[in-house]
Amino acid sequence: KFDKDVKAWAHFDKKVLLEKASEADEHRRSGKPVGPLHGVPVAIKDIFGTVDMPTECGTVIRKGKSYSQNAEVVDLLHAAGAIVMGKTTTSELAYLGPPKTTNPHDYSRTPGGSSSGSAASVASFMAPISLGSQTGGSVIRPASYCGVVGYKPTYGLISRNNILRTSYSLDHV
């Protein structure tokens, strides 16, 4: 309901999310080993390739299309037990024009970058953690505008495989 104003989500399926959460609960109850992020919901920017949900990259050209392989970082999240809860909005191709997302603290303002949906989803308490990408400020600016922490790791530390590329030498996850 809140997302009607913030518009943080490009893809969110509540039914699938609740099924994944139930499976995580059952896994924990079974006594099987769990990962360090077991059951933690994580949002991801809609340029991270996924096989089980659309990766539209903010453009109608990719409407409803998925990747044939997950982004490596998505596989790492799954291996750690995290639940990918959905895709957050981005500007078209993570580059063109402002995204439709609004700042959850003032709907008349923008979160300020292509990872706007990621920052807004955390700032509005819709997601505890969200992954974004940055070429020229797309993580740190929206995080700052939305009052949350944006972390930009060392270049190349996190694989960019199966993530829409804007600039090979500048893109960060």
Segments the model singles out, each with a brief description of its role:
Residues 119-173:
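Fold-level recognition of mixed alpha/beta catalytic cores in primary-metabolism enzymes, strongest
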Residues 1-136:
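Gly/Ser-rich catalytic/binding loops embedded in alpha/beta enzyme cores
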